[in-house]
């Protein structure tokens, strides 16, 4: 699905991500792909380029591996923090597997065990966790709420490897189910639960069930609002990262089909780790691999003729640290010119 905001007429699409820099309305950029294809390097590099043309940029990793800290050589956590050497580019790392316990704890001192000592705490947690993905949904909703209040001009998500990448799209439904179950519990047992909780010191932060339900409702509204923005091609796009191999191409196609079904714009693909052995190269393995890569590159070009396809070379060293990331990021904008084959 290509964005009408980007593509017009019969223009051939540039093999760069320059269009993302030119799209001034863009607010949310998701970078996703199979593990090990250079997704984090690509998202960091894109963030560096966007920081050149935007007032404030936030890079968020939702990958539990937390590779942003490794990429920049700087520790990040769940609070947004400026990246060394930049005055308008910040980063944060959150764990989308964070627990619903944080919501129940309301940030109190007992966050590690908000239900400690409460006989029916386990029952509430069992109820909440019986809904698949509810803990991730709550955690992600809290992050989106925080991000909304931070008012960054553009936000880039370095997502978890494919499979988990698109789970955020199901969150509004998951939250509605959770809300429905808890509302049902509250209407049936609310007075009794509140009196028992009151006798035992209540929930952490002095909350009762109604307050928890109200908090969940406000989170559901926030995530519903953001979800509507995700479906607006002027505000949101998804950059697919892959390598020229069968499994990676298969995952990319599956992801693009899913994004299309969710009405989320995607019109850029970054193909990493391409080999370009010279004519006189004596490396037979390199030539064989290049032959295989060319086959899948041709398939990518046929399948995604209405996409900006960026070809990135295999590098001899890891892309870590500000200088190497900046160098890599330049190739996302100025196409790499390989030696003659």
Curated annotation (Swiss-Prot):
The active site is at 63. Its EC number is 3.6.-.-. Zn(2+) binds at residues 283, 286. NCBIfam families: GET3_arsA_TRC40. It is found in: Cytoplasm; Endoplasmic reticulum. It comes from the Eukaryota. The lineage of its organism: Eukaryota, Fungi, Dikarya, Ascomycota, Pezizomycotina. It comes from Ajellomyces dermatitidis (strain ER-3 / ATCC MYA-2586). This is ATPase GET3. Homodimer. It holds the Pfam family ArsA_ATPase. The gene is GET3. Signal peptide: none annotated. Disulfide bonds: none annotated.
């Amino acid at each position: 699905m290509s964005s009408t905001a980007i593509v017009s007429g019969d223009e051939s699409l540039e093999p760069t991500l320059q269009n993302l820099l030119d799209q001034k309305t863009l607010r949310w950029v998701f970078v996703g792909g199979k593990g090990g294809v250079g997704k984090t390097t690509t998202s960091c590099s894109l963030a560096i380029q966007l920081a050149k043309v935007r007032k404030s940029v936030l890079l968020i990793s939702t990958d539990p591996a937390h590779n942003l800290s490794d990429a920049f050589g700087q520790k990040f956590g769940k609070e947004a923090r400026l990246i060394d050497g930049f005055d308008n580019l910040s980063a944060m790392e959150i764990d989308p597997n964070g627990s619903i316990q944080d919501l129940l704890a309301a940030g109190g001192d007992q966050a590690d065990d908000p239900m400690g000592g409460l006989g029916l705490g386990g029952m509430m947690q069992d109820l909440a966790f019986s809904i698949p993905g509810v803990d991730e949904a709550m955690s992600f909703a809290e992050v989106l709420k925080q991000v909304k209040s931070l008012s960054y001009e553009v936000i880039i998500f370095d997502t978890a490897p494919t499979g988990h990448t698109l789970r955020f799209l199901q969150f509004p439904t998951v939250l509605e189910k959770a809300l429905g179950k808890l509302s049902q519990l509250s209407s049936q047992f609310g007075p009794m639960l509140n009196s028992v909780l009151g006798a035992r010191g209540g929930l952490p932060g002095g909350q009762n069930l109604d307050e928890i339900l109200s908090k969940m409702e406000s989170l559901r509204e926030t995530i519903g609002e953001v979800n509507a923005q995700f479906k607006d091609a002027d505000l949101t796009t998804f950059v697919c990262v892959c390598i020229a191999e069968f499994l990676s191409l298969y995952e990319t196609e599956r992801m693009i089909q899913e994004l299309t079904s969710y009405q989320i714009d995607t019109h850029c693909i970054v193909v990493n780790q391409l080999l370009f052995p010279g004519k006189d190269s004596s490396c037979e393995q390199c030539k064989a691999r290049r032959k295989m890569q060319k086959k899948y590159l041709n398939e990518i070009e046929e399948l995604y003729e209405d996409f900006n396809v960026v070809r990135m070379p295999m590098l001899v060293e890891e892309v870590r640290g500000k200088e190497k990331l900046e160098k890599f990021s330049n190739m996302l904008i100025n196409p790499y010119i390989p030696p003659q084959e």
